[in-house]
Amino acid sequence: MDRPPPDQQRQKQAPLFSPYQMPRFRLNHRVVLAPMTRCRAIGGVPGPALAEYYAQRTTQGGLLISEGTVVSPAGPGFPHVPGIYNQEQTDAWKKVVDAVHAKGGIFFCQLWHVGRASHQVYQPNGAAPISSTDKPISARWRILMPDGSYGKYPKPRRLAASEIPEIVEQYRQAAINAIEAGFDGIEIHGAHGYIIDQFLKDGINDRTDEYGGSLSNRCRFLLEVTRAVVSAIGADRVAVRISPAIDHLDAYDSDPIKLGMAVVERLNALQQQSGRLAYLHVTQPRYTAYGQTESGQHGSAEEESRLMRTLRGTYQGTFMCSGGYTRELGLEAVESGDADLVSYGRLFISNPDLVERFRLNAGLNKYVRKTFYTPDPVVGYTDYPFLGQPKSRM
């Protein structure tokens, strides 16, 4: 059994483990479960395995963010990802949310649409995926197919400007469904090369209409989605995630700081009208959505730090960071004021009691990458041991 070190009491008082007041919710600590695709919602409907998985990772007054949950039938780009666009899915999520609330957790639903990061096999009637562009994702990247193999990303269909309001409405309705399911709020996934990021980044967005070209135009879709969701459920239940300096799925921008600042300034203006958002969630440049750590994708570590601190210093509200954080980096980020909250992904996969392990500075279970995206409801999902339990045999 792992034993806590002598400085256990001092670590319990560290800022990472101190309470935090969000606009609507009070947290008991600053360690957040990051949104992570796990491919266990068979047929797009969350089942008992998801309820157990999230409940295992719940602490009293802790914030959890669900895996990416698609807002329409055209939204998926992985097998067995959950949706929240119909009544069956909404009702199924209620049981998962109830399991989290029963343990005192605060639960946000991440609203997701992958855009061009999909394949005809995931699309209604085998249609081409939709995007801001008709450029496909390069052969550098591969898509996970339903049979577990990997394939090439196909050429997407460029959305007409007249089609975009329908997608905005899908986000709005999904947010309403999330609140009906009992979620405490939602996070708009505007990061990691998915559909909103496909409008934000000038390396993808080659449009010449009101949704392309200038920074203002490239930010338009995100702002329309955010305003629609805020009008439906209230600003203090709405969060936004961005990753201006990450080129995952070819989502490259020529000036990440300028892009990040453009988003932040517009969110600040929105907050002046609608009230404070729940938080802004920014992924550190060293992270990619496939779990790789790549420091310096867009420059030196100093430049990456400058980006995060610039956004932190400009955004008027709760600032959450993520991307390859260790316990020590999380302690430092909160203590230095670089972030209010820190979200953890892979470490939470293999350590359902991560918050307690961090408090005690206890040892951590190692995650098994090959089980990240498998449909097994137990192995690599709910069978990682808690402190004091025998080690997993995986």
Curated annotation (Swiss-Prot):
- Output the superkingdom of the source species: Eukaryota
Question: Known Gene3D superfamilies for this protein?
Answer: Aldolase class I
Under Enzyme Commission nomenclature, its number is 1.3.1.42
A Gene Ontology biological process term: oxylipin biosynthetic process
Catalytic function, reaction form? (1S,2S)-OPC-8 + NADP(+) = (9S,13S,15Z)-12-oxophyto-10,15-dienoate + NADPH + H(+)
Q: Which pathway does this polypeptide act in?
A: Lipid metabolism; oxylipin biosynthesis
Under InterPro entries, the record lists: Aldolase_TIM, OxRdtase_FMN_N, Oye-like
- Binding-site residues, FMN: 35-37, 110, 241, 324, 345-346
Swiss-Prot/TrEMBL induction comment: By wounding, jasmonate and drought stress.
Give the location of motif Microbody targeting signal in residue numbers. Answer: 392-394
Q: List the disulfide bonds.
A: none
Q: Where do the catalytic residues lie?
A: 194 (proton donor)
Q: Further remark, if any?
A: Over-expression of OPR7 in Arabidopsis thaliana opr3 mutant functionally complements the male sterility phenotype and restores jasmonate production.
Report the function annotation for this chain.
Involved in the biosynthesis of jasmonate (JA) and perhaps in biosynthesis or metabolism of other oxylipin signaling moleclules. In vitro, reduces cis(+)-12-oxophytodienoic acid (cis(+)-OPDA) and cis(-)-OPDA to cis(+)-OPC-8:0 and cis(-)-OPC-8:0, respectively. May be required for the spatial and temporal regulation of JA levels during dehiscence of anthers, promoting the stomium degeneration program. Involved in carbohydrate transport underlying normal lodicule function during anthesis.
Question: Mind telling me what this protein is named?
Answer: 12-oxophytodienoate reductase 7
Q: What is the lineage of its organism?
A: Eukaryota, Viridiplantae, Streptophyta, Embryophyta, Tracheophyta
